[in-house]
Each structure stands twice: as C-alpha cells, then as structure tokens.
C-alpha cells in the first residue's frame, strides 16, 4: 500500500444517502480504519412529517452494518442553529437570498464535524461530496477541484473551505460519475442503493418554503409594481421572494398594457406579449415595494458587473486580477469574466455576457479550469439607473431570535 493509501483512521460523514455510503465502502476497501458519524443538524421538526432525520439514521446504521464499521450519532443542532440558521434568517430579513448549504459546509461539516473527528483520533475526514482535493506540488497548497461528474459537481458549495480543512479532507466519489456510484452500491448490496438523492435545504424538507419561513419571519404586505410604476397587486412580505422568481407572485392574470408593450419593443425585447410571465426584479425595503418585470430578457434582469463581500479564497490569499470563469448560482454554466479587483474581503467581477437575475445573498464562485479559487457573497450588481435603490433600513419583524 503506497503512502497515499497507507492505513489511516478516517471518519466518514454518513448521511444515510448512497454517496456517503459508497465513500465509506471505498475507504474500507483501501484498508483504512473507517468510523461513521451521522450528523444531526436540525431538531425543531423531529416529530413532523417533513423531518427525515430518523429515517436517514436508520439507513446510515444499516449501511454501517453491511460495510462492517462503527457508527456514532452526533447532535450538532445547537451549532447549526447558532452558526447557520441564525445567519439564514438575518439574510432573509434583510431582503437577501442566502445559501445555507455553503455556510453549513464551512461551519458544521468541515469545522464542528472535523473537530469532533480529530478528537476521535482521526487523521482525515471524508464525505460524499462530488469534488476533488489535489496537492499542488509546486506551491505546496491544496487545491479544490470540480468533481469529475459535471452534472453532480458540488465545488460551488465547498468554496469557503480553507487549507487546513482541505488538507484533512477526502472526497472519494468526486473521482466517479453518479452512475458508477449507484452501480457500486448495487453490486455490494447496500440497502440504500436506490435511495433518491436529497434536494433542497435540509431543514425545510418537502414543505412549501413560504410556509416554513413564515414560522420565523412576520408577513409585511406591500405593493407589487411593474417597471412603469403601475401597481399590479400586493405581496405578503419582501422576505418571501427572490430575484428571478416567477411562480407564486399572485399576478398571473395581469396583462401588460399597450404603452408597456411599446416600451418593451423600444428596449429591443424580443417576443414580449401581453401574456408574457412576470419576474421579480428588485426588492425595495425603503418603500416595501416588490418590483416585477415582464419577459425573461428584460434589462432589469441582466447584469454585467457584480461586487461580492465576505470573500473566502481557497489558497488563503486573493487571486490576481485577470480572466477566469464564475458561477453566480449552483448548476449555472461557467461564465467568462474578468476579476477586476480582489482583496481578502471583497471582489468585483465584469462578465463578457449579461448574467440573469444576479441575486444578493447568493455566492459568486470563481474558477480557473477545474480549479475552484473561492468566492464571496453577492452584494450588488449593475442595473439600469431607473431601478429603485435597495436599502435595508426597514426590515420585517424577526419572530424567533
């Protein structure tokens, strides 16, 4: 067994899903001492129909039994509530749209979980993420790379990981395609081989997002206006909407008027008719107004420049300015951009082509080829000057601290 695969104590985050199960199996086959940890990160809905935690633990325990490893149930719910969920609520309250999975990875799975694993004497941790870690021999730094399966790559969610975290982390299934992972699970008889992949935010489950958020943030109704200032209806609270949103606006039957259609034609919008769908374009917290526009290619939905804050760089220092690629949302195709400036805290990107519905609170993540450089939280993007300025001076009441 070579040095890379010399026997080590490795703690695997077993979620009950097939990816982490195959991760544990592959490491056990390599001769490592593997210990499974099931992370319980949410307990507010333990008795509800939306909580799958108990079922997931049963699945994880069954996997551990088949593979022949120990499994421990560890409760990180308090850490999750303090470090992830509280920030999630603050961001929504301020009119932004956060990505809690990114914060969960940085604060829970690769911090609290990593710390727990080290206390167990682990040399490494491993998870079922579709990403790769590579040590650059010339720089001595650990690089975060996209997973080999482009349809499953999760490096976007991992861009906040630092050198200390990456040096202790393995992503075995990042070297595989999902079809191979399913095949391995089926061949060795894993009980969750055909289990459906989890989707969405873990603590929300399958319930309607608005119903969940309304438990914590009070409704604050206000007007819905189009780009010419016409009132089209009433919203339930700005926190319950995100830029680019099309469904759930309650104005599906509203048609554009003649003057509005002419204005769209003058802007060069192609194919805009009175029955075109409406999209959320801006949330103005000063006036509690939800601004919507008609047509997917409306200029209010297009941005070529964005600024990001709270940046985190995998190498530990900001990359040099220059051409690279970026994603402003998960599953987006890499977009060519110029990194105009970058510090340890902020960066500015200029895109070769307009980006659709760039959303404050989401993350802009930078790449050079398959290498993820890091990124930051989108703070603002360039939009027409006629668009009202977003302010956070007036925010809805936070029901639960």
UniProtKB/Swiss-Prot annotation:
Q: Which residues bind ATP?
A: 13-20, 39, 128
Q: Which residues participate directly in catalysis?
A: 104 (nucleophile), 202 (cysteine persulfide intermediate)
Q: Where is this site: Interaction with tRNA?
A: 129, 362
What Pfam families does this protein map onto? tRNA_Me_trans, tRNA_Me_trans_C, tRNA_Me_trans_M
Gene Ontology cellular component terms for the protein in this record: cytoplasm
Give the location in the cell.
Answer: Cytoplasm
**Taking the first listed entry, what is the main subcellular location of this protein, grouped into a coarse class?**
cytoplasm
Report the record's Gene Ontology biological process terms. tRNA wobble position uridine thiolation
| Region ranges (Interaction with target base in tRNA) | 99-101
Positions of region (Interaction with tRNA)? 152-154, 329-330
- Which top EC class applies here? transferase
Write down the EC number. Answer: 2.8.1.13
Catalytic activity reads:
S-sulfanyl-L-cysteinyl-[protein] + uridine(34) in tRNA + AH2 + ATP = 2-thiouridine(34) in tRNA + L-cysteinyl-[protein] + A + AMP + diphosphate + H(+)
Alphabetical keyword list: ATP-binding, Cytoplasm, Disulfide bond, Nucleotide-binding, RNA-binding, Transferase, tRNA processing, tRNA-binding
Q: Which SUPFAM superfamilies match?
A: Adenine nucleotide alpha hydrolases-like (SSF52402)
Q: GO molecular-function annotation terms? A: ATP binding; tRNA binding; tRNA-uridine 2-sulfurtransferase activity
- Disulfide pattern: 104-202
Tell me the Gene3D superfamilies matching this sequence. Adenine nucleotide alpha hydrolases-like domains (2.30.30.280), HUPs (3.40.50.620), Translation factors (2.40.30.10)
What is this protein for, i.e. what is its function?
Catalyzes the 2-thiolation of uridine at the wobble position (U34) of tRNA, leading to the formation of s(2)U34.
Family statement = Belongs to the MnmA/TRMU family.
Protein's UniProt name: tRNA-specific 2-thiouridylase MnmA
- Taxonomic lineage per UniProt? Bacteria, Pseudomonadati, Pseudomonadota, Betaproteobacteria, Burkholderiales
Please state the gene responsible for encoding this protein: mnmA
């Amino acid at each position: 067994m070579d040095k890379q695969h010399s026997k080590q104590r490795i703690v695997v985050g077993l979620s009950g899903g097939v990816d982490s199960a195959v991760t544990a199996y592959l490491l056990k086959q390599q001769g490592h001492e593997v210990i499974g940890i099931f992370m319980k990160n949410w307990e507010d809905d333990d008795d509800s129909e939306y909580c799958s935690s108990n079922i997931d633990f049963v699945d994880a325990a069954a996997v551990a039994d088949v593979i022949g490893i120990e499994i421990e149930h560890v409760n990180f719910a308090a850490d999750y509530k303090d470090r992830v969920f509280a920030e999630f609520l603050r961001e929504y309250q301020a009119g932004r749209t956060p990505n809690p999975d990114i914060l969960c990875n940085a604060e829970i799975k690769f911090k609290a979980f990593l710390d727990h694993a080290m206390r167990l004497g682990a040399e490494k941790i491993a998870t079922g993420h579709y990403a790769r870690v590579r040590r650059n021999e010339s720089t001595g730094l650990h690089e975060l790379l996209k997973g080999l399966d482009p349809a499953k790559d999760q490096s976007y969610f991992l861009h906040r990981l630092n050198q200390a975290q990456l040096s202790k982390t393995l992503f075995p299934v990042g070297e595989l395609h999902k079809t191979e992972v399913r095949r391995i699970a089926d061949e060795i008889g894993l009980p969750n081989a055909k289990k459906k992949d989890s989707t969405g935010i873990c603590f929300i489950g399958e319930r309607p997002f608005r119903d969940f958020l309304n438990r914590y943030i009070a409704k604050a109704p206000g007007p819905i206006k189009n780009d010419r200032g016409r009132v089209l209806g009433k919203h339930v609270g700005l926190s319950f909407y995100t830029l680019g949103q099309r469904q759930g606006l309650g104005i599906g039957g509203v048609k554009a008027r003649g003057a509005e259609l002419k204005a769209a034609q003058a802007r060069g919008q192609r194919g805009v008719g009175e029955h075109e769908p409406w999209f959320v374009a801006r949330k103005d917290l000063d006036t509690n107004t939800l601004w919507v526009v008609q047509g997917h290619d409306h200029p209010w939905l297009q941005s070529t420049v964005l600024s990001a804050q709270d940046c985190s760089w995998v190498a530990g220092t900001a990359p040099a300015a220059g051409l690279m690629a970026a994603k402003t949302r998960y599953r987006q195709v890499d977009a060519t951009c110029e990194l105009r400036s970058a510090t340890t805290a902020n960066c500015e990107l200029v895109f070769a082509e307009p980006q659709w519905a760039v959303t404050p609170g989401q993350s802009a993540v930078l790449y050079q080829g398959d290498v993820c450089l890091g990124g930051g939280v989108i703070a603002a993007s360039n939009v027409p000057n006629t668009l009202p300025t977003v302010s956070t001076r007036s925010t809805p009441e936070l029901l639960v601290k």
